[in-house]
Amino acid sequence: MTHYSVTLKNANAKELADKIEKILIEEVPPQEKISFERKVGDADAFLYVYERRYPLRQKGIVTFNVLITDDKKETTVDVSVSGLQGVWKNKTGEQFIEFVKHGIRDYEIKL
């Protein structure tokens, strides 16, 4: 599993979620199965799940999870990729995370 977490200052969780969703939609080929699940809790949490299912000769599932939580003071983005690596448009989990980092580069990272 590949994991990345970053805490941001002055970020809007919904705007951030929309931006990451746009990255996923643009990077996932239209013929692939893509599903988004948005859950909003007390702390404005957004959870995105993407799964790619393989043909029978290549059994396996790759799942991308993006969890965005916002407690009004700071916003945290957690990204994890599990399953077989290197199969989502020939990209590894690390490369997918680079897409996410690219999408949030305009925000101020809390050190």
Please provide the spans of the model-predicted regions.
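Beta-strand/loop substructures that line and gate deep hydrophobic ligand-binding cavities in soluble
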Residues: L56-K91
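Hydrophobic beta-strand residues in large extracellular and virion-surface proteins
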Residues: V6, I20, I68, V77-V79, ...
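A conserved amphipathic terminal alpha-helix motif
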Residues: L84-L111
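A structural detector for beta-sheet-dominated domains
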Residues: K9, Y50-E51, T69, S80, ...
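Terminal, regulation- and interaction-focused segments at domain boundaries
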Residues: M1-E32, F36, I109
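A short, structured loop/turn motif at beta-sheet edges
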Residues: A13, K39-D42, I68-T75
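Amphipathic, interaction-prone secondary-structure segments
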Residues: G41-K59
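Ordered hydrophobic segments in well-structured contexts
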Residues: S5, S35, F46-Y50, T63-L67
